[in-house]
Amino acid sequence: MDLRIASVFSGVGGIDLGFEQHGFKSVFATDYWSVACNSIQLNFPESEVICDDIANIDFKKIKNKQGGIDGLVGGPPCPPFSKSRFYIKEKKRGIDDIDGYTSIINYFRALEELDPKFFFFENVQGFVFKPHKSALELVESESNRLGYKIFHKVLNAADYGVAQTRQRFICVGVKKTMNDFKFPNPTHSNPEKKIDKTKNWVTCGDILSDIDFNLPEDEKMQAGS
């Protein structure tokens, strides 16, 4: 039987899709944006989708309706923790920003009410920057309060075969009674800093190499258009 996941701050369901591709089953998702919710419902027709502010959702009812949830996944909105926020002086950063704080609090409220075996928390690399130390401490304290041990790391998507150097903070929590979580070893590495037994990073050129550039339409196009 597939492990059943619920997602919050689901967007169009990218995290849900990744988990489904690795044997999990998405049974619940929620987002505030109706366009995103419509996309999730089309891509995961068997999932329950609620389009609402996460603060309004009773996750105990979701748990009871679904007959239990194995995992909670999601990435709270990243603007308060992004590098670009350092240049916007009029806005607060990290959990000093009310949206940054409440998004984390509501994530862990969902975790408490769903009481799954594990959780997956994703955010931008800036989440672990020194000025945002209190945000990571909040994640650590809430995890401990709810009976989870956590394992976190900044991962680069390029190290796992994706054609972009996207770095993200990944935090996985498991019940304290369960075995420790181990991050997978990189499968790829920067050819200039080669790691043994890994392939070179995949480039956009690699991805686009099989495209036929000799198209009839090219004759009608101007250079630079």
Regions found by a protein language model. Give the residues of each.
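Conserved beta-strand elements of the Class I
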Residues: 4-6
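Conserved SAM/SAH-binding beta-strand->alpha-helix loop
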Residues: 33-34
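S-adenosyl-L-methionine
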Residues: 38-63
